[in-house]
Amino acid sequence: MNQEIKKILKNSLITSLIVLVYGIVVRNPIVYFGMFVGCLISTFCFYMICQEAESAMKSGSPFKMTVTGYMKRYAIYGIYLGILVKFFGFPVFLGGAVGLLNIKFNIFLKVVSTQFEKIKKKLSSLK
């Protein structure tokens, strides 16, 4: 697995732990149940994507493998969000939806920090 992917997974787990600690401190089930579990599911599904990509490269039918993986991930998302709406209500559902954006947030931060470092390097070379 690529080092950047490992770093994204590590940062995602750290973000999940921060969300859990924050949820426990404020004693809010929206945060510690909805967002934390959403963060974990997001991290797990990103790991599934990485594993499927590696095995699709070695497989004879990568299209079928990736489509079924895609459907599995969205079924996991749908079941999780459906359970939240049905049993815990709309606010916890929104917290879970925000938690599912954990990987996307960490990838965004990685891209922004990389761009910031490039700009900083260009500015320092101008001096």
Curated annotation (Swiss-Prot):
InterPro entries: ATP_synth_I. Belongs to the bacterial AtpI family. GO terms for cellular component: plasma membrane; proton-transporting ATP synthase complex. Keywords: Cell membrane, CF(0), Hydrogen ion transport, Ion transport, Membrane, Sodium, Sodium transport, Transmembrane, Transmembrane helix, Transport. This is ATP synthase protein I, sodium ion specific. It is a multi-pass membrane protein. The ATPase of P.modestum is of special interest because it uses sodium ions instead of protons as the physiological coupling ion. Its main location: membrane. It comes from Propionigenium modestum. It is found in: Cell membrane. Pfam families: ATP-synt_I. A possible function for this protein is to guide the assembly of the membrane sector of the ATPase enzyme complex. The keyword Disulfide bond does not apply.
